[in-house]
Amino acid sequence: YADEIRGIVEGAGLKITELSTHLQGQLVAVHPAYDDLFDGFAPEAVRKNPKARTEWAVQQLKYAAKASQNLGLNAHATFSGALLWPTVYPWPQRPAGLVETGFKELANRWLPILNTFDENGVDLCYEVHPGEDLHDGISYELFLKHTNNHSRACLLYDPSHFVLQCLNYLEYID
């Protein structure tokens, strides 16, 4: 099946460079305040059930790892989700340890997925984006720390929203 799809695409003079699971990645880690907002990204069968929605999203990412491998791809694009995003502004003050706890949980959710991507020989590239727990270089480095610098946890470079994030699109590469 993958060979057929790749053949159709290549027959049109195009090449598949990566697949994307931005919406499914978002659903791996949803802060409860955003449950209703993000339910629309999931199938009706798992809406209004955060646990089932998360399980569905995790499985979709694992399927995507295999699909990427089947298509001969070595990179895959996604979002990290946002357990901590509602606390990004430091008022009111966050309780001590909240950020560490949040990133430990984020890593716990993503490690099985990262391992599946590793088993399939595919890098998982997170787009740093407003509204995501991975929204800049510092948050990405904290995520790496909690995933023990997982070799498949990579960045997707999309500077289209860097002005909104007050990030210099050239300095960011360094």
Task: State where each predicted segment sits.
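Residues at alpha-helix caps and immediate loop-helix transition turns in enzyme cores, especially N-
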Residues: 1, 136-139, 168-169
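Aromatic-lined substrate-binding rim segments of carbohydrate-active enzymes
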Residues: 1-13, 18-19
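Short amphipathic alpha-helical segments and helix-helix/interface helices
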Residues: 2-6, 114, 141-144, 173-174
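Long amphipathic alpha-helical scaffold regions
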Residues: 5, 162-164
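Active-site acidic/histidine proton-transfer and metal-coordination neighborhood
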Residues: 11, 28-157, 164
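Short active-site-adjacent helix-start/loop capping segments
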Residues: 17-18, 25-30
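Non-cysteine beta-strand/loop elements that form the S-adenosyl-L-methionine
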Residues: 17-21, 77-79, 154-155, 174
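A short alpha/beta connector and helix-capping loop motif
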Residues: 146, 165-174
